[in-house]
């Protein structure tokens, strides 16, 4: 199984995985409108892989099979104040 990964022109660290190059037929129009112009980043074989950098491999495969796409959102921002308060509260 191969996938093609596109990055969003509008949102940093947001990626869209699809099964075939330039085939967005199964991606909802609303999602594409918010995503902006997809910029192809890479083609990737999923078979034989053990993991992906920032996405769960099994979730990606299942989403591609079930809905035809997988949307990778950026990680939540670090809350350094919360981390600091928790660290001094534990001491």
From Swiss-Prot:
Transmembrane segments: none
HAMAP family to which the protein is assigned, alphabetical: UPF0745
Signal peptide stretch: none
Protein name according to UniProt: YcgL domain-containing protein ESA_01460
Disulfide bonds: none
Lineage, highest ranks first: Bacteria, Pseudomonadati, Pseudomonadota, Gammaproteobacteria, Enterobacterales
Domain YcgL: from-to ranges: 1-85
Gene3D superfamilies: YcgL domain
Species in which this protein is naturally found: Cronobacter sakazakii (strain ATCC BAA-894) (Enterobacter sakazakii)
């Amino acid at each position: 199984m191969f996938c093609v990964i596109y990055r969003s022109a509008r949102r940093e660290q947001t990626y869209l995985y699809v099964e075939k190059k330039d085939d967005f037929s199964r991606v909802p129009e609303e999602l594409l409108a918010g995503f902006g112009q997809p910029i192809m980043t890479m083609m990737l074989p999923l078979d034989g892989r053990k993991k992906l950098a920032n996405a769960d491999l099994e979730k990606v495969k299942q989403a591609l099979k079930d809905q035809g796409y997988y949307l990778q959102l950026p990680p939540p921002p670090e809350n350094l104040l919360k981390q600091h308060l928790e660290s001094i509260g534990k001491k």
